[in-house]
């Protein structure tokens, strides 16, 4: 052991130990912290999504209430040829524009989310939905507090209804960072009944690996949904007064209609059964000729999300919406299950998907985050390899020092 240099050995042990500590910090502590900060839903962010549907069918509320704004005069919307008098329905392209913004709250780990959705037919706004809720920034799940609100507006009817504060559950506009291959609970923005959002399979969207998720929202009464939310915050006396209302009055209350508008809406929701049902459907639902029916709106949808799993970014979103008239819940389910689609009973039907600009914008959001994750993984790998190498060197230096000391002890004993 004549070549042993104690000072050099000590310096090597010190340097190796420092490299090990730094390697552990860089390889195992700093990346998780960086990823945690990346996964936090940012405050002050805005997402603009534009959906398009090449073919849609919509109840022509303008012609019913305000002929001066009838989009049937536009080249993009034409009247549907139906056995009913007048231009009761339109067909043509439809647009769905959504803007989602986030803002800070008094809690660092929570963020406010505000969304505005607008359905546009023939250049005219047909429906708007504004909603506000609060999310946990690290999971993108709603907080368990009654802070969520909604406002539905139907411009052709000059009506709007505000849904009082309630507790939102399930995913809605954002997916968790590091999305898993499993089912999630999904809260549709139109009706707030939770439905399963099931993982389907891995796919590729614009060259990027993605997970495909699918949710089906069964037929739900829009009137019942709105009244349920309203009654959930009302006093017992208010609940009793709502229960005493006639179906027409409940319809008027749910949509916030004035008396004149309510009378106009009755023209497309009440009448003899043969006006709304084909002869085969009359037989299916056991209607007699001339039997009066009173219909209400039902909503159903299928949603398909394509999610980049590492960042939770929605790369594409398809939604098939069908809002139609039915007399009751049982009939609505039968219409859906047996595919008894009749344009006369259609309120709104469209198959929406992100347009190319929105897909590109979402890809531009995901790409730099994916690059940062890959860089962190590479840094972590290099740091861990360096740590292992430094540990090997440290062990070798410690063994050499121990052997040197053992040799010195033997020499002293022999002397």
Across the structure, where does each feature detected by a protein language model lie?
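Solvent-exposed N-terminal domain segments of exported/luminal and surface proteins
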Residues: 2-160
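Juxtamembrane interface at the cytosolic side of transmembrane helices
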Residues: 3-18, 30-31, 371-415
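Hydrophobic transmembrane signal anchors and adjacent membrane-proximal interface regions, especially
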Residues: 49, 59, 295-299, 408-410
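Short N-terminal edge-element motif at the start of the domain
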Residues: 156-192
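Membrane-proximal low-complexity regions enriched in glycine and acidic/polar residues
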Residues: 184-323
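Membrane-proximal extracellular "stem/stalk" segments
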Residues: 278-380, 384, 391
């Amino acid at each position: 052991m004549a070549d042993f240099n104690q000072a050099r050995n000590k310096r090597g042990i010190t340097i190796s130990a420092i490299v090990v500590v730094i390697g552990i910090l860089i390889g195992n502590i700093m990346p998780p912290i960086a990823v945690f900060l990346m996964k936090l839903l940012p405050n002050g962010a805005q997402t603009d999504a534009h959906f398009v549907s090449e073919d849609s069918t919509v109840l022509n509320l303008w012609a019913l209430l305000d002929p001066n704004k009838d989009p049937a005069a536009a080249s993009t919307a034409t009247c549907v040829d139906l056995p009913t008098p007048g231009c009761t329905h339109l067909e043509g392209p439809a647009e769905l524009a959504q803007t989602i913004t986030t803002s800070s709250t008094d809690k660092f780990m929570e963020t406010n989310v505000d969304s505005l959705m607008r359905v546009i037919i023939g250049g005219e706004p047909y429906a708007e939905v504004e909603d506000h809720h609060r999310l946990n920034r690290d999971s993108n799940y709603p907080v368990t507090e009654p802070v969520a609100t909604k406002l539905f507006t139907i411009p052709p009817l000059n009506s709007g209804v505000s849904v009082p504060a309630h507790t939102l559950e399930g995913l809605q506009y954002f997916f968790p960072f590091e999305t898993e291959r499993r089912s999630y609970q999904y809260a549709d923005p139109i009706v707030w009944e939770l439905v399963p959002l099931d993982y389907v399979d891995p796919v590729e969207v614009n060259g990027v690996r993605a997970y495909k998720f699918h949710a089906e929202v069964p037929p739900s009464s829009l009137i019942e949904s709105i009244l349920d939310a309203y009654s959930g915050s009302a006093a017992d006396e208010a609940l009793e007064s709502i229960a005493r209302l006639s179906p027409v009055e409940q319809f008027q209350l749910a949509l916030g209609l004035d008396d004149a508008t309510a009378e106009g809406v009755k023209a497309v929701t009440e009448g003899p059964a043969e006006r709304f049902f084909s002869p085969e459907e009359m037989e299916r639902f056991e209607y007699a000729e001339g039997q009066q029916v009173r219909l209400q709106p039902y909503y159903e949808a299928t949603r398909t999300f394509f999610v980049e799993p590492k960042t939770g970014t929605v790369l594409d979103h398809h939604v098939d919406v069908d809002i139609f008239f039915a007399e009751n819940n049982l009939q609505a389910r039968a219409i859906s299950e047996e595919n008894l689609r009749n344009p006369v009973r259609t309120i709104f039907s469209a198959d929406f998907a992100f347009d190319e600009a929105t897909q590109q914008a979402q890809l531009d959001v995901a790409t730099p985050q994916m690059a940062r994750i890959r860089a962190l993984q590479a840094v972590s790998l290099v740091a861990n390899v360096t740590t292992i190498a430094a540990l090997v060197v440290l062990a070798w230096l410690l063994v050499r020092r121990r052997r040197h000391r053992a040799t010195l002890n033997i020499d002293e004993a022999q002397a």
